[in-house]
Amino acid sequence: MFDIKEDQNGVVVKVRVQPRASKNSLAGEMEGALKVRLTAPPVDGAANEACCKFFGELFGVAKSKVEIIAGHTGRNKLVHIQGVTEKQARFILK
């Protein structure tokens, strides 16, 4: 199971990003992280922007409520989603 931690404002999800995919989608688990495929290339923050937008749409929150808190320049990221509980996150991501 991938790592999800709840804090006072929301949840932090450990994510492994695969840029330049054919479509934006969840792709299971990889090395304890949620694998996410994104169509955006890893250039000038495009994949990071797409990652925030994808999680915002997935959880039904504004893109501004989703923030990458670690891993800005790598594939492994920690994504913070405000206004979501761990239970809600596990239900949506299962």
UniProtKB/Swiss-Prot annotation:
Record-stated family: Belongs to the UPF0235 family.
Protein origin, superkingdom: Bacteria
Organism (species): Desulforamulus reducens (strain ATCC BAA-1160 / DSM 100696 / MI-1)
Alphabetical list of SUPFAM superfamilies matching this protein: YggU-like
Pfam families noted in UniProt: DUF167 (PF02594)
Matches recorded under PANTHER family: UPF0235 PROTEIN C15ORF40
Any one GO cellular component localisation term in the record: cytoplasm
Name this polypeptide is given: UPF0235 protein Dred_0717
